[in-house]
Amino acid sequence: MGTGEYQVCDKCHKEKSIDEFDILKYNGKQYHIHTCKKCRYEIRKAKKNALSNNIDILIKRKYKEIRPERILDLSLTDIEFIEYDEIFIKLIDYRDIWLSNYGRVIKKKDDTYVLAKFGYDSNGTLRCYAYKDTYVNGKWEYKKSTIYIAKMVVQEFVVNADMRSNVFIWHKGMNKDDNYYKHLYPLNKEQYRIVKAHYMETGDDSEEFIVKVMNDRKFKPDYWSKASMKPIIAGKGYRGGVGVDVTSRVYKRWCDMLQRCYNAKFHARNPQYMNCYVCEEWLNFQNFKIWYEAHDYGEESQDLDKDILIKGNVMYSPETCCLAPHIINTLIVNSARARGDYPLGVYFDNEKNKYRANLAVGGKQIKLGYYDTPEEAFARYKKYKEDFIQDLAEQYKEEIPHKLYDALMNWKIEITD
């Protein structure tokens, strides 16, 4: 019940019941504030949602580099493109499935390519089902898994500067049926709230506005600071947050990766790494840590490998790298410096005046005979090593991811390696 008293609000200039004004106590007396409760709420809301002045644009809108080896040749299918720039890329942790940058999914069934059927969850989020390679009770097996389309499109096509917090996805125009990668923005909870509020009020969700929100300190998580963005490792890598355990195995792996790519002294000793680089997402340690912990497995020592899944690859990224047992990784390593003037695995024996084929495994040398030409010696080395790699893959079958097993079974040694 009201008191029967009224007052005009200084903000909206409307006469309202005195009960709609907060009370302020001053010098032992009570006064009614001259701005009504509703207007005060709107003022606080506007201040909370307003962008800061002079925002430093440290994070820019970027898209992932797609390796051509991952792109499906659509001529192998009866499926047509919906737009000129549509591509389907292999999801390396799933069985026989390809994702489009427009959010369409192709599955391979009995040597036939078909478009996957979609459904919606209770929140209206588009999804489909696939079989994901999963480490369970000491072995890898394909388990039925849900693919949320927008989330997967972002994961495969869009650079996410902060995977730890950016778990919300803004669809341009608030249209959840639009999963084109250039219309999806990974945001944290507060950033998503700001973009949504601004769009509902103004109809504006331009990239310029969203990038400002992404960079505004007001809407960053508590662990973020400008200092955490400073590239302190090899002039490229930044920690992405406070409280990082610099003694952890994952941090050391991250540092080693950056040194391989950007340390001139390391390149002087290992010139084969001179053209290598780290993808945009992994320059942030927090992002690398999320991937590493999700893919770590088993008790055996694992190496971070960039070459097995895609031969000749020079980019360290979630889409091109895997963790492989050390003995497997050492078999695949290509060292031009160690090879010398002859093909890989071939040495000239001055005493016998012949070419010797030799395979080094685990610190031991396996002699494969002597030959009149380096080509003959290499042919023997090639056959033996390919068979050896396949035998090793069979020994590790179910103990290593399917993508790694498949790569090993199809690995070819070339004279140009």
Spans of features found by a protein language model:
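Short cysteine-rich clusters marking metal-coordination/redox-active sites
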Residues: C9-C12, C36
